[in-house]
């Protein structure tokens, strides 16, 4: 198994030099964001959770044989823009937008949460994963798998269907987000290295031209 929890509750700073990933859970109230988070960090399904409460969780995991320290913010279900929400939107490195497959309105509201990210970050190039939760309640399904896949394609992000009750697909969702964060960081690093090489080449050309001018004098 590629995702392995090493600790359910970690100290305030990452241990062993692990890379810290700040993850923000978004989605309408009642879609199971907290249950998904709790299953990931502690393999437990909560009996009750107040959807108006925002909470933070930390855990140490290994993903693709690399340590990862996840700092997960589980947000309330409101899609309104607030000063506090702006603060954690700015700090988040990756986002999981969650909806319930048994609630079409929560699926439609996914667009609102994606727009909230854009309002703060002014770009759509932010690591993102779309999650359709509660697939164990298949008899009450209102949103098809195909609809979820199509929306994720529009968002240019990975898509996972999960069941917090059965702990199905939970690790895959967080794993996918961390991989996307790493991928984008790797791309950015590659661009920066290319720019540095171009800058270095440009300086060499200018130095060569300067030397030629000096020799002509």
UniProtKB/Swiss-Prot annotation:
Tissue expression profile of the protein: Expressed in ganglion cell layer (GCL), inner plexiform layer (IPL) and inner nuclear layer (INL) of the retina. Expressed in retinal ganglion cells (RGCs). Expressed in horizontal, bipolar and amacrine cells, but not Mueller glia, of the INL (at protein level). Neuron-specific. Expressed in ganglion cell layer (GCL) and inner plexiform layer (IPL).
Mutation effect (residue 52 to A): Loss of interaction with AFDN, RLF and RALGDS
Protein name, per record: GTP-binding protein Rit2
CDD domains: Rit_Rin_Ric (cd04141)
Organism, scientific name: Mus musculus
Principal location: nucleus
EC number: 3.6.5.2
Lineage: Eukaryota, Metazoa, Chordata, Craniata, Vertebrata
Top-level taxon of the source organism: Eukaryota
